[in-house]
């Protein structure tokens, strides 16, 4: 009593306290970062190593395996995957959430150093690492185009000047430059000319290496001067290499230009990048795992004018893709939804109280509670994101509940003739415990979420804490500011109603009278209500088992990613043509704004595309509908497949795949894996629950298998080392020398001129110089025949692995797909030597599925414990919790009605309903207990009177929560796919709960009382008119 009086009789102090809360909130709001979702990125580090010309199997055994054995010893590694392709190995390390990325990077570098002695000596450079997840979509893509500069020159500008500067920007984790390679001097050899001159490829390599050296020459000194010695020991351009003497034949000099075409070109000619049908260099920028995407993008944009000045005017630098506009638009939509929710909630209060003066009170208390929450969010290190803003939107209905309960009870005393200050004190005292019970039991719902681990726990923690803080501030405001304003603003007389509102008042009275009559009937037919209650419990179980489930709603971020997978024997020239064809099909779609893509590198038969869609208000279709439309057009392109998926804000794992979900096959027996993977993939491709089924196992690449006759080689004076060196020199784009320039280092690349390697007859033109100096054709000691070979070798841990990726067809959920895959694996009878498991997002979904029911039970148990402590009773909490089954049925039926799967967002809605719907029962039980203790009423009369007296605040709080959530259901635009499941769940649960709990709660209350009476042998009582 004294606590409430302290604030009611000291209005200045109470107002200043509220102003202080508001000012802190405004300050926190201005400093809060902006993000699409809470920070849930796993720390990921990518290790890269190269050995030009080495086969995928060689890279896997000699490079990947030694590195994996060393890296696998690092503490906190939750997953390690690797992929080895032609001349390249990439190892992805995913760490536990709590692992510091910088500390992990130091451990990775130490592990690389430890494995260095086990790696091949011919590697051109040491393995390197990057603190970025290569499977994440870039946060920004920049393109360089020019009508004047070559692709190699553009790549040089990008990698030498732009990429290092961008990499230094806070938040940037990796800048991947694609579309070409660094400039190089390329030496294209003529095999016939070499044979005629008696010059071997090793002779050419040695001559070039010896002619281009950079060594210290020292200095000369006399008594007074010192001269630095400088020589022309370096060759820098193709024109300087052309006249180089590489051999003497019959006394005549054989120059490099006599046996080769020397050009200024690029290191790897098998790379291509494009933007909107124009050749381009791409800078794909990814953020650090812990970085804020909006801040990082803003920092990059601020740096762009400076970057533009560092490159020639003839080079056009453009932003091809930027993730931030969609994120900003989504947050603006949520902010608008929040404002609408506040307005609707205040409208509900006005309609029920029919007093402008009384409506001002919640109109002040609600913003104070919400704005004050921003200060706590800032102190907790949170961000303004879709989930935290949705928490505030939902909190609108919660925070007004406390004010409504206090305000309505004070208004009732005023209408009875009590003086304002006395009514404020008495009314607050009567409902203070009720408000405290509602708030604490609501916060208790979120305690299991705060203790939940893994990605779901990290994702939901910010939502739970934000909502809990808002409820806590609301509790403080409703017991301080609200009664003070009631005492000083409201009048003792009954407020005058506007004529247009009298009809609503009469309707409310009629509704209350009708409820009273129906309640009397129900209380005399309790068995029927008991059956209904038991039926809702059973229906909950059935609906939860049968409803489709998924991990997270499929987002429309306005960005699509496409992975191209062509025939495994396709040439680079044909693959570049496929890229152009696919880009044209997509570019012609009316919903597409921009298309960029690239192909080449170590995987000639694959490519990537990044598609920016037009803003949401400029297109009528969702991203998934656009994918469905494009899938039909793309299927007509022969010889290649393009798999499209919408970029998501949440992506788990480091695997680069062509679809959103993955199923990984592991085996210690590589032969068994290669036997069963095609069978499993073909089976999964027939399932209607899956779409775009593809695999990263590519073991049907074309290979030319050479078999050496070692006896003949020994007789001819040729060793295997010389033969292998010949092949590497001829076909491996061998980097044989380095050109040092002030800004970068460039390579001299040697191979047989592509004009002489158009078919397998090129092998017949190759020869080796034996130990007697004679030219021995390759065909003398080797035979060759076509064969199949893997284009990539993949590992997970240290086991051979193959990952099957898939998307979901329209109308199918992840639970449908998971169940179908499990059935297919059982039907196929896959041996125990091949193990299958879901990976990435699908794996997290499986883990979340196993914990959802436990989480809901834990929330209910926590609420029961809190209520039991507050009421000092084992029974009354059960009465209050009896409201939950009807809310669950309503939520699940609403999801089914709107064809929305049960996701993590819907789970949040269920948890919220546990907190919301019990408020009705708390208000009933509190007043019934009070009436029994002080009014000398029977339990039946007490609960009946409590239901009637609390009917208006129950209707007000329920409608306030309903109208607070309704904008989430009705909102459109960016990010609406996240808001809809939450709104649908809450609205459906509230509607069903309101219809049933007004009757089931008093029946359950009397049921437990009759149990008490039966044990104490008291006579049964009935309700009288």
From Swiss-Prot:
InterPro entries: AcrB_DN_DC_subdom (IPR027463), Acrflvin-R (IPR001036), Multidrug-R_MdtC (IPR023931). It is found in: Cell inner membrane. It is a multi-pass membrane protein. GO terms for cellular component: plasma membrane. The chain crosses the membrane at residues 3-23, 333-353, 360-380, 387-407, 431-451, 463-483, 528-548, 853-873, 875-895, 897-917, 953-973, 984-1004. The keyword Membrane applies. HAMAP family: MdtC. Part of a tripartite efflux system composed of MdtA, MdtB and MdtC. MdtC forms a heteromultimer with MdtB. This is Multidrug resistance protein MdtC. It comes from Shigella sonnei (strain Ss046). The gene is mdtC.
């Amino acid at each position: 009593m004294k606590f409430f009086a302290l604030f009611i009789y000291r209005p200045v102090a109470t107002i200043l306290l509220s102003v202080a809360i508001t000012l802190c909130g405004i300050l926190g709001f201005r400093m809060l970062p902006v993000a699409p979702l809470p920070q849930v990125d796993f720390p990921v580090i990518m290790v890269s190593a190269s050995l030009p010309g080495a086969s995928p199997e060689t890279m896997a055994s000699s490079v990947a395996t030694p590195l994996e054995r060393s890296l696998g010893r690092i503490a906190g590694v939750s997953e390690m995957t690797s992929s080895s392709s032609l001349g390249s190995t990439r190892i992805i390390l995913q760490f536990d959430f709590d692992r510091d990325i910088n500390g992990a990077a130091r451990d990775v570098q130490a592990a690389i150093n430890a494995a260095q002695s086990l790696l091949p000596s011919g590697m051109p450079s040491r393995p390197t690492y990057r603190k970025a997840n290569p499977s994440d979509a870039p946060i920004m893509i920049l393109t360089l185009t020019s009508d004047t500069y070559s692709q190699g020159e553009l790549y040089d500008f990008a990698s030498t000047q732009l990429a290092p500067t961008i990499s230094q920007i806070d938040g940037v984790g990796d800048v991947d430059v694609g579309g070409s390679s660094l400039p190089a001097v390329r030496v294209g050899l003529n095999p016939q000319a070499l044979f005629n001159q008696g010059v071997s490829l090793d002779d050419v390599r040695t001559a070039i290496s010896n002619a281009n050296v950079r060594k210290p020459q020292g200095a000369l000194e006399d008594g007074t001067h010192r001269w630095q010695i400088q020589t022309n020991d370096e060759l820098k351009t193709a024109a300087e290499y052309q006249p180089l003497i590489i051999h003497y034949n019959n006394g005549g000099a054989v120059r490099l230009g006599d046996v080769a075409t020397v050009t200024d070109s690029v290191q790897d000619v098998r790379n291509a990048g494009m933007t909107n049908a124009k050749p381009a260099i791409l800078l794909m920028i990814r953020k650090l795992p812990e970085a804020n995407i909006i801040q990082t993008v803003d920092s990059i944009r601020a740096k762009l004018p400076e970057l533009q000045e560092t490159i020639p005017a003839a080079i056009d630098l453009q932003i091809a893709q930027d993730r931030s506009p969609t994120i900003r638009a989504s947050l603006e939509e949520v902010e608008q939804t929040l404002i609408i929710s506040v307005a609707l909630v205040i409208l509900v209060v006005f309609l029920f109280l029919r007093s402008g003066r009384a409506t001002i009170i919640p109109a002040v208390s609600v913003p104070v509670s919400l704005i004050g929450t921003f200060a706590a969010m800032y102190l907790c290190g949170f961000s303004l994101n879709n989930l935290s803003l949705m928490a505030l939107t939902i909190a609108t209905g919660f925070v007004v509940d406390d004010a409504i309960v206090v305000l309505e009870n004070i208004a009732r005393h005023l209408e009875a003739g009590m003086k304002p200050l006395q009514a404020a004190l008495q009314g607050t005292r009567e409902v203070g415990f009720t408000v405290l019970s509602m708030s604490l039991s609501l916060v208790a719902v979120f305690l299991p979420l705060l203790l939940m681990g893994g990605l779901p726990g990290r994702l939901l923690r910010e939502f739970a804490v934000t909502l809990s803080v808002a409820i806590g501030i609301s509790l403080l405001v409703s017991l301080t500011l609200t009664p003070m304003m009631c005492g000083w603003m409201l009048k003792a007389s009954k407020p005058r109603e506007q004529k247009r509102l009298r009809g609503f008042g009469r309707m409310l009275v009629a509704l209350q009278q009708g409820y009273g009559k129906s309640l009397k009937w129900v209380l005399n037919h309790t068995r029927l209500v008991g059956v209904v209650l038991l039926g809702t419990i059973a229906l909950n179980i059935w609906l939860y088992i049968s409803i489709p489930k998924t991990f997270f709603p499929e987002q429309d971020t306005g960005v699509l990613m496409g992975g191209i997978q062509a025939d495994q024997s396709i040439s680079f020239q044909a693959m570049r043509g496929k890229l152009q064809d696919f880009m044209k099909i997509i570019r012609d779609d009316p919903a597409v704004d921009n298309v960029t893509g690239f192909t080449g590198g170590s995987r000639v038969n694959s490519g990537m595309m990044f598609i920016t869609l037009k803003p949401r208000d400029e297109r009528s279709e969702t991203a998934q509908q656009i994918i469905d439309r494009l899938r039909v057009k793309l299927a007509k392109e022969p010889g290649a497949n393009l798999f499209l998926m919408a970029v998501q804000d949440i992506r788990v794992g480091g695997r680069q795949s062509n679809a959103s979900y993955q199923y990984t096959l592991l085996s210690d027996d590589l032969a068994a894996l290669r036997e069963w993977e095609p069978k499993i993939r073909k089976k999964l491709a027939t399932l209607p629950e899956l779409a775009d089924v593809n695999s990263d196992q590519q073991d049907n690449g074309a290979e030319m298998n050479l078999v050496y006759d070692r006896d003949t080689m020994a007789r001819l004076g040729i060793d295997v080392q010389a033969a292998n060196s010949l092949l590497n020199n001829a076909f491996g784009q061998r980097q044989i020398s380095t050109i040092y320039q002030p800004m970068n280092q460039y390579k001299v690349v040697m191979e047989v001129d592509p004009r002489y390697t158009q078919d397998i007859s090129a092998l017949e033109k190759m020869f080796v110089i034996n130990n007697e100096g004679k030219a021995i054709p390759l065909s003398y000691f080797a035979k060759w025949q076509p064969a199949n070979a893997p284009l990539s070798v993949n590992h997970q841990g240290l086991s051979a692995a193959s990952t099957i990726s898939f998307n979901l067809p329209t109308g199918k959920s992840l639970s449908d797909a998971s169940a179908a895959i499990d059935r297919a694996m059982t039907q196929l009878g896959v041996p125990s030597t091949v193990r299958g498991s879901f990976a990435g997002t699908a794996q997290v979904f499986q883990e979340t599925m196993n914990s959802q029911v436990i989480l809901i039970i834990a929330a209910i148990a926590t609420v029961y414990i809190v209520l039991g402590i507050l009421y000092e009773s084992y029974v009354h909490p059960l009465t209050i919790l009896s409201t939950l089954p009807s809310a669950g049925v309503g939520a699940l039926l609403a999801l089914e009605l709107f064809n929305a799967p049960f996701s993590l967002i819907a789970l949040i809605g269920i948890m919220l309903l546990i907190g919301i719907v019990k408020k009705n029962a708390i208000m009933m039980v509190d007043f019934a207990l009070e009436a029994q203790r002080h009014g000398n009423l029977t339990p039946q009369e007490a609960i009946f009177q409590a239901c009637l007296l609390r009917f208006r605040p129950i209707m007000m709080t329920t409608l306030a929560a309903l109208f607070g959530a309704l904008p989430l259901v009705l909102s459109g635009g960016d990010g609406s796919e996240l808001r809809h499941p939450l709104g649908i769940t809450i609205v459906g649960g509230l509607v069903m709960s309101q219809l049933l709990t007004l009757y089931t709660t008093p029946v359950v209350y009397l049921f437990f009382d009759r149990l008490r009476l039966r044990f104490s042998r008291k006579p049964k009582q009935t309700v009288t008119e």
